[in-house]
Amino acid sequence: MPEPIGKPGDVHDRGTGRVPGPAICGRRGPLVGVIDHGSGNLHSVCQALQKAGAHPKLVSETRMLSAVDAVVLPGVGALGTAMANLRRINGVQQVQELVQRGERPVLGICVGHQMFFEQGTERDETVDGLGCLPGTVVPMPTSRLPHMGWNTVHPPADTALFTGISGERFYFVHSCAVVTVSPCALAHVEGDAAALAHTGDDATDPETGTGTASPGAIGHTAAGPESAHAMTGRNGHPVRTTTTCHDGCTFVSAIECGRLCSTQFHPEKSGPAGIQLLRNWLAMV
């Protein structure tokens, strides 16, 4: 497990001892602060960042975020719990300001992705998010929950986050999502419903090898002539929306908005495609 930022020492790998930071052009890669708010797949995230060429450090005191080159906000479980944990470490305003200034790349993963939106609903209660992106997180309107396993993504043509990634699948584990940002947000998905069809969600966990494959579902596109770039985030940049279909439900699976990026899927569990996505994000440093 990586040591907290501000303490001497490099990232540690369970079972192998000390692991030196990767060398890029004769030096270590970007110093990435992984926010430890008590809800996140921290060990796997840090290992994946190392493979992508970064030097990850856990940050439990958000005032230390000024010392890093980029920031990851991970999260698992419930949105309300994750937001409460972030408030507990006085991180809400700091993360909002990071996104607003746009000086460092910021990446949200899974519930961390959901935290950047305006609000969410869970158990008939409304939870305020960080408000950096337009949209509401809701329980997905399908009986096949959780959405767990491998699935395809459909990014817009001009996204930097998916450069060099085509036709790959990513690993999802979630029951809530931003099903609709606005009618125009999903309009970039080209082609007819067949273009979004997939052969099935492989529910095998890439780390444990457990799980089963579930039947496939035919996707659908959202109607509307408007461009997804009609929306802007709090930082003033256009919102580039990537979508995924599960059991007939199209939802937002990734966002790129200036130097703010977020993914509903887990890049750290998504094999080579996930590592390439992290490299693309690190290129924004």
Where are these regions (language model features)?
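An anion/phosphate-binding loop that grips the pyrophosphate of nucleotide cofactors and donors
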Residues: V68
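Two-component/phosphorelay signaling modules centered on CheY-like receiver
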Residues: C46-A54
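Cysteine-nucleophile active-site neighborhood
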Residues: G77-W150
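Amide-donor transfer/coupling interface in amidating biosynthetic enzymes
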Residues: I24, G135-V285
